[in-house]
Amino acid sequence: MKTDLTHVLDALVDRKAVDPVVLDLRGLSGATDYFVIVSGTSAAHVRGMADHLVTALAPRGLKPHHVEGLAQGRWVLLDYVDFVVHVFHPELREFYQLERLWGDAPVVAAGDDGGSQ
């Protein structure tokens, strides 16, 4: 699983993901093991990161079980069953505060801010 998460983060950071975080939900949620949470800078950026992630993971045999929000580009949810990727527009990430909602979940990875340079 760690290898899959590494590929997820690499693909998102490659597309300038902002504030990437991975939460370990094992023991806290029966729905999934990990949340990967990132932000984009615009709806186009959010859609582009989500599209790139699906394309980048496909050769590894990883395909999302379900995708929500791609057309709008405000909050794209990619459900890979063992992990769920949330790609947010900044305002929605701040509004929903998943990191705070799941505050008991250990942060197992947090990357550099790919969007600042």
Q: Model-flagged regions — what are they?
A:
Residues 78-80:
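Active-site beta-strand termini and strand-to-loop segments that position acidic
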